[in-house]
Structures are given as C-alpha cells and as structure tokens.
Regions:
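N-terminal positively charged helical leader segments and presequences
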Residues: 1-69
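RNA substrate-binding interface of SAM-dependent RNA methyltransferases
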Residues: 1-24, 68-160
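Short, solvent-exposed coil/turn linker segments
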Residues: 31, 60, 156-164
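Residues that scaffold the ATP/ADP-binding catalytic core of kinase and kinase-like folds
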Residues: 38, 119, 163
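Short, solvent-exposed beta-strand edge segments and adjacent coil->beta transition regions
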Residues: 46-48, 73, 124, 167
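A contiguous loop/helix-start segment that scaffolds small-molecule binding in enzyme catalytic cores
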Residues: 164-170
C-alpha cells in the first residue's frame, strides 16, 4: 500500500505527466500529520509519500551457497559498520555493482531501522542480507567453498573497479 498527501500526488502528476505511477497500487490519501505518525516523526522524514511493504524473505548464508549454481558470486561482509545510513548507502552501492549478498553481524545489524530502508533507497529489495552470529566463522566457511576474501582500505593503491571479480569473491 502507498500512503501520500494530496500535495505529493499533485507534484508526482506534474513531474511525471506521461506516466501512470500508481496504476497497480492501492493508494490511500493521508494528511501530513497522519504520515508523521506512520513514520515516527523524529525518526524519518517522509516527504509526503510512505510505502508499506512486506517483510523480506530471509535465507541463511549456508542455504544460499548450497542452492546457488552461479559461477560468479560476489558478496560483501561488513564488520563494525552499525550506522543505518552508512549501511543503507553500502546496500545502494552494492546493488549498483551487482553484488549478490551482504553478510552482517546479527547483533549489530539495525534491521528494524527506518533510516536503513530510506538510505538504501529500495536497494534492500534487490540484495540478500545474511545475518550471521560470527563473521570470522562465516568467512572461514566461505573459504572452504572456494571464495576469495579481499579487504578494502582507504590507503590502497589498486582501484577495486579495475579488479577481475570473476569467480567467488567477498
């Protein structure tokens, strides 16, 4: 379902006259105050439009590896990244680079954060999130499945976009 203010509807129609943006979506009109209440005003700014989405299906890292027959699999592992905005930005970038999944520590991943979803700009719907209890153990497991583990550093001399990411990589 999509909730929006009448002002937001007018702006969307004005900016996208040739598109019928909500043709197959249930749209409910609400006041700005009602949208504030839906979002938790202190937590996130809604800009006049709020979408209610279903919870994403979760799969374990082991299930993903077992069922995935692709020759090239690229994953990202995050450690000590806890800010929802930063994680959302990483998710957005990962989707742009066709990354297959994100491995995060279960206890430090802000899965209920609305800021995470907003920062990801819809990207969270296009990537698998693997919540693990121990990142080190998960990386060791992936190495037994022929994954290469690389790390990024701000002082690195090599541009990661120039690397050949064929095969199985983290």
């Amino acid at each position: 379902r999509v909730f929006l203010t009448e002002d937001a509807q007018k702006k969307l129609n004005r900016d996208n006259q040739s598109l019928n943006l909500f043709k197959s979506v249930n749209v409910f009109y609400k006041s700005r105050k009602e949208l504030d209440n839906l979002c938790g005003r202190d937590e996130i700014a809604h800009q006049g439009l709020v979408a209610e989405v279903e919870q994403l299906e979760e799969i374990t890292l082991k299930e993903f590896i077992k069922n995935n027959k692709k020759q090239n699999i690229n994953l990202i592992a995050l450690e000590e990244v806890t800010d929802p905005r930063n994680i959302g930005s990483i998710i957005r970038s990962a989707v742009a680079f066709n990354i297959d999944g994100l491995i995060v520590k279960e206890r430090s991943f802000p899965s209920k954060s609305r800021l995470l979803y907003k920062s990801a700009s819809g990207g969270i719907e296009h990537i698998k999130i693997f919540k693990v209890s121990n990142l080190n153990t998960s990386l060791k497991f992936l190495k037994t499945k022929e994954f290469w583990v690389s790390a990024f550093d701000v002082t690195a001399k090599k541009d990661f976009t120039k690397n050949n990411w064929k095969g199985k990589n983290i």
